[in-house]
Amino acid sequence: MLRDIIRNLSNGFVRFKGQTIGVVDERGEIAAIYKGIPQNDIGIRTDVIDNVPKSEAMRILVRSMAPQIIACDEIGSKEDIEAINYVMCSGVKGIFTAHGNDIEDVCKNPWMAQLINNHIFERIIQLNSKQKGDSKCIIA
């Protein structure tokens, strides 16, 4: 799902101009870079940093690529949260994923709880892995 969001925001669609996206792909699960070329379709305005720790990659993207949006999968460490604060304070929007059974489960991680309680996010969407298409907007 994250890859589809990235591709659509990057390419644009009817009445929505594509945005420059910076993808943090620490383990190569989003873009699947091979010899410098994404093997997955992630859009025409997308730059990728792979095989670099997420926190470092986010800072590099902000400083050197000037993306409008940064996308990163599986956040949760203290370093990730500090980097997200840096990204958001730099005026860059973000799309981030975190794994958990529900929002309460995600908030058991003290760093994630801090990020959520500081109202860094404009919107949090909870997906239900047991029932396809079932989602709930927590913050809007």
Model features per residue range: what roles?
Residues 10-61:
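P-loop NTPase switch/communication element
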Residues 6, 58-59, 81-84:
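Generic hydrophobic/aromatic pocket-lining and core-packing "Φ" positions
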Residues 2, 21-26, 71-72:
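Short, conserved beta-strand edge motifs with alternating hydrophobic and charged residues
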